């Protein structure tokens, strides 16, 4: 299988190629089209993605027309990043008449964690996280080589946006946490999920995991026509109004005061 994967869900722009059972990838930090003084402007996803795809295909000696499918990180995540990934994947898919595979960003985090039972929490801003929980059973000898083991993936609870104190608590021991939500809301999530066996806040969405999950989904017949693919936003609001911002600050102050009083 030849499968191209791309992910612009969060701050890192990444692409990967699954070619004859071997995964190769490259990534770069991306900004959102703004610069933060005094450092230089960070290139945006839209500036980075196509050159990275061209460079990876050239490095691997694979023409775009050789691809069987294109997978992309569909969300949840940065609304702008999701639209860029979906738009680029659609453009490429339509150009070469290949299907797309939309991969949930939280499932890619759970896969990247390497754990069998993982709760993925991605900082959603506005006092919330995107979260979901998965059971993943990996086994050797998958059809796409050692970089993509055969796997069954059970969604224990579906992706959602919620406050850290409202994250569903999975039943049973052995669960691990992954994602930057565990650093952005460390105290609240530790209180909500005290029984987690471990936490890795460094795990983030990325094209390598998107490629692996995309290959599994493609084999299962879950690819769609490029024109039908769409991001999965989970929520439809990107900013708080002034009253909501004030309420969020007040709530944070109350939590800090309560924490200090214990």
Features from the language model and the residues they span:
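N-terminal beta-alpha supersecondary unit
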Residues: 1-74, 204, 259-262
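Surface "functional belts" at beta-alpha junctions
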Residues: 22, 28-44, 99-205, 219, ...
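Stable alpha-helical structural segments in soluble proteins, enriched in small hydrophobic residues
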Residues: 56-60, 95, 113, 210-218
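Phosphate-handling active-site elements
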Residues: 58-65, 93-103
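DPxDG-like acidic metal-binding loop motif
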Residues: 71-99
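Flexible, glycine/charged-enriched surface loops at secondary-structure junctions
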Residues: 223-227
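Amphipathic, membrane-active segments
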Residues: 243, 250-251, 256
